[in-house]
Amino acid sequence: MLDLVIVNVPYMFINNPPLAGAVLKSCVEEQGFNAKSMDYNIDFVNHPVATNDIVLWLQKEDSPPQAENYINFKNWVKECAKEILSQQARWIGISIFTKDSQLACEEFVVALKDLDPNCQIVLGGMGQEDRRNQWGARWIDLMWNSGIVDSVIAREAEKEVVELLKHDKKEFVQALQLTVEELDNLPVPNFDDYNLDLYGDLDPYSTEETISMPITGSKGCVRKCTFCNVASFWPKYRQRNGHNIGKEIIDLYNKYGINYFKFTDSLINGSLKDFRLMNEYITDRMPNTISYKGQFICRPARHMPDRDYDLMRSAGCKLVQIGMESGSEAVRDHMGKKFTNSDIERTTYSLADQKIRQQWFIFVGYPTETDADFEETL
């Protein structure tokens, strides 16, 4: 008998296997429990029920699908629920990655409880905290107050899911942020339950590799930009040790044979010390073998000398996504970005010299932006 089944539900992109299931599986198995990860999102996107109107509805609930397609979707969910229940797990954990998984989660929960009212369901994931516009309340509060789920873990579940299995408590847990030491001591994620051949990086800005492996080096952000909600989820920025991250990358490469890694971090160079340590660790042990991409913040030359860009290239950095946001320093200052146009120029050329591709995020229509500010961006 399994202790835990970790379920991913639609809708998510399929550029990499879900990280939550792999992380939680390794955490509970390290403590002597057994778990299985089941990705029904990858099954969905390869199934005839994934019609355009169903996908749109999952992402935008005020766009109802055709009745026949909705019935087919519900029947598919019911078959998935039967398969989940056949695992005979003590707990069924459903991971809600973004708000795009909320509607599917509701369908899965109803189907599971219809088939077995005594099954124990715990919800988790950052997507459960998004608000429902028509109710003005967090979605997870609506689910909990309805009484249809047995437990909820809000925020970081790596420790709390182990406590759930130890004590079988049916409660709403507002998890505390993990400390840096706790992040460094997490086991390497276990992707054994996923068919990795089914995943592919469909991002048009990706490198030539097709299958990517997700990895988390930090949680939170060193900035608190006015338009961003990252600080509301992770108030304190925490960074794993760079050697720890580099070792995990190499361990995953050696185990699964995938050499392309995608960071889930808000930024990969928040801690320059650990960013250097990671790049040095990979360069020293496996130069020009690994490829990775991630989100990046523009920094002045005094913070990131040329050697840092050399290390990025030798460690395998192929693409960075940068929140440049605006060509106007006045707009960026109001946002809290804290870099100059000279910093942008220097960062751009330094990355280009190392043949590291760049994808910029540009913010048009920021509240303080004037026509002159917009012209600076152009």
What are these regions (language model features)?
Residues 13-17, 101-102, 271, 301-302, ...:
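Alpha-helix N-cap/loop-to-helix initiation residues
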Residues 159, 184, 243, 261, ...:
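Residues in well-ordered alpha-helical elements
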Residues 50-54, 169, 278, 335-337, ...:
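Short low-complexity, flexible loop/linker segments enriched in glycine and/or proline
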Residues 308, 368-378:
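Catalytic cores of alpha/beta
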Residues 47, 133, 158, 273, ...:
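Short, function-defining helix-loop hinge/capping sites that tune catalysis or transport
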Residues 25, 106-110, 140-144, 161, ...:
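Short amphipathic alpha-helical segments and helix-helix/interface helices
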Residues 189-366:
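Radical SAM [4Fe-4S] cluster-binding motif and immediate context
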Residues 2-257:
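Acidic, low-complexity intrinsically disordered segments
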